[in-house]
């Protein structure tokens, strides 16, 4: 009986080994490169390089393709891009929902981030603008946030132009006396915040979490009216303004991805990252000057116990 049991265990082990070998032998299912989009903020750079690194670990050819938050969608729908780690659903433009409905873009799931977006300002601005954090206070003290180029209106730093016009749309909709000025890039926006803080100068800016800056500096968020429905920036009114629709961060692939690269699809569907993961990575890159590829490779090396389960 012991010999039979041992034989059964050996046979079972052999089947498991041969099964893993068969799986490994079938990957990559195609030698065509998986084209992964990289965009223009550090957190997305990190999630992109983690996904790309894991795909390479599995044996896939990977090509990184530059796009942005809006232009990625037609590129994914046409198959010129195959995978995006971060689609922020409140900043997708007019095409995205229709392309998803048609099946040209496939939503794999959420990445795992808990995002927040809105206007931030340093706490010392509450002395210069009594009534903050309530957004209505900004109507009375816009000049406190003004500059030579915007006076008597306040100066509002918004997202870079390629990220959409949500702040501009809302300012126009609720007739707030601010001049929206697009930030040049994430790095330029962070530099402006740090410069303003060091001199206690006025600043108000559209920003987002996760981001390392909230672990290093104090900021308050402008508060808006709660809403039970969808918060649409361009159709708000002064008395009932709800601010900004908060995002889900979705992982998406091109049509036919699962059929062409099934093991890659399985891994990507299981892949998750947290705010803590991205905050730590952004700090290493933006503050310590490390290369994002190096930081992503380090995360992969230190977290095999996590990502190995995504591939099994």
Residue spans of the language-model regions?
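A conserved helix-loop-strand patch within extracytoplasmic ligand-binding domains
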Residues: 104-159
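Ligand-binding pocket segment of bilobal, Venus flytrap-like solute-binding proteins
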Residues: 81-85, 157-233
């Amino acid at each position: 009986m012991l010999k039979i049991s041992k034989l059964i265990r050996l046979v079972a082990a052999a089947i498991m080994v041969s099964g893993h070998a068969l799986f490994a032998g079938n990957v990559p299912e195609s030698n065509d490169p998986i084209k992964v989009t990289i965009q223009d903020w550090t957190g997305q750079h990190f999630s992109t390089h983690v996904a790309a690194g894991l795909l390479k670990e599995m044996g896939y050819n990977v090509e990184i393709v530059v796009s942005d938050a809006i232009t990625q969608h037609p590129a994914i729908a046409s198959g010129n891009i195959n995978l995006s780690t971060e689609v922020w659903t409140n900043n997708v433009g007019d095409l995205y929902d229709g392309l998803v409905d048609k099946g040209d873009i496939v939503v794999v799931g959420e990445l795992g981030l808990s995002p927040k977006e809105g206007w931030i300002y340093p706490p010392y601005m509450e002395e210069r603008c009594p009534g903050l954090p309530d957004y209505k206070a900004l109507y009375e003290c816009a000049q406190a946030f003004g500059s030579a180029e915007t006076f008597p209106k306040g100066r509002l730093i918004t997202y870079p132009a390629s990220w959409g016009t949500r702040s501009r749309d809302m300012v126009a909709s609720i007739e707030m006396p601010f001049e929206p000025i697009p930030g040049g890039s994430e790095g330029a926006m962070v530099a402006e915040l740090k410069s303003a803080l060091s001199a206690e100068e006025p600043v108000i800016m559209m920003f987002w979490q996760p981001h390392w800056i909230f672990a290093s500096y104090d900021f308050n968020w402008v508060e808006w009216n709660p809403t039970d429905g969808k918060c649409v920036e361009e159709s708000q009114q002064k008395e009932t303004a709800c601010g900004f629709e908060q995002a889900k961060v979705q992982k998406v692939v091109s049509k036919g991805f699962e059929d062409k690269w099934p093991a890659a699809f399985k891994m990507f569907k299981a892949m998750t990252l947290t705010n803590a993961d991205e905050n730590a990575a952004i700090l290493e890159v933006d503050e310590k000057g490390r290369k994002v590829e190096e930081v992503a490779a380090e995360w992969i090396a230190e977290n095999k116990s996590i990502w190995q389960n995504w591939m099994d």
